[in-house]
Amino acid sequence: SLELVENRFLDIKKNKIEHIIIDGSLGNSIVFGKEISNHSSNFSKFIGRLFINNKEVYSNFADTILGDPLNALLWYFDQKLRLKKYIKKGEIVSLGSITPLIWIDSPCNVKAVIDDLGECSINFIN
């Protein structure tokens, strides 16, 4: 999936993390690819790649997400249980980002690919 964020700060690096979290601008929308079935037991070795206008701009292993994306899922489950809350059927859980935040400031096509899992893309226009 691709996570869409808004840049509502003049200089995001000069803001306290608490203000950014409260604003909610960094968790705005998600673009999904096609649903797939994968029976891998080693999600941390998947490689995520980000392309802008068909040029690869970043790649990294999924182990950047707490050492293994499943660790992020376990953390989420633990937090829900600690708060005595439940995960609802059909709830979507995004586990984190393999790539860094990249600001888009002009029309382009952005594609995210996770090797052996699939891809999704979005076109930004004026």
Per-segment meaning from a language model:
Residues S1-G67, L73-L74, D105-N109, L117-N126:
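Catalytic-core "active-site belt" of small-molecule-metabolizing enzymes
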Residues P69-D105:
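A conserved acidic, glycine/proline-rich C-terminal tail/linker
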